[in-house]
Amino acid sequence: MTLRLESLKSNKGARRRKLRKGRGIAAGQGASCGFGMRGQKSRSGRPTRPGFEGGQMPLYRRVPKLKHFPLVNPKQFTVVNVSALNDLKAGSTVSLDSLVKDGIVTSPKHPLKILGNGELKTKLTVQAAAFTASARTKIEAAGGTCELPE
């Protein structure tokens, strides 16, 4: 038997007819159309909105509002871990511009912050807006220095 376009058939049950509700008892979905007896969920129109608890005071209104949330002007940093600095040349000066040039950071939108995840084996002079305590100790233990911009 050759595979021809006119000999193709759908799998059994792949193409089902649309269920037509409310078209008589014999159709299988007549009378209450599968919505049960009475009540809000059997009525036409949209279902209740998310968070609606049937008239009871909903949770999002029972819980108090938090002061100063969300933060109005949160400090945002471009973060780089110490382990990412291992690939750089020893004795070089590391800044946000040099990291963008080397492809470690994609955009210089926010000031640079160095985090202390990983180990540092190369001696570097790192210029950043902020350092974590562990990052500062690891840079200085490798013989490097940490500099804050003016």
From Swiss-Prot:
GO biological process annotation, one example: translation
One GO MF term: structural constituent of ribosome
Keyword terms: Ribonucleoprotein, Ribosomal protein, RNA-binding, rRNA-binding
Pfam families according to UniProt: Ribosomal_L27A (PF00828)
Biased composition (Basic residues): 12-23
Region (Disordered): 1-57
Biased amino acid composition, Gly residues: 25-37
Protein name per UniProt: Large ribosomal subunit protein uL15
Species per Swiss-Prot/TrEMBL record: Synechococcus sp. (strain WH7803)
Upper classification of the organism: Bacteria, Bacillati, Cyanobacteriota, Cyanophyceae, Synechococcales
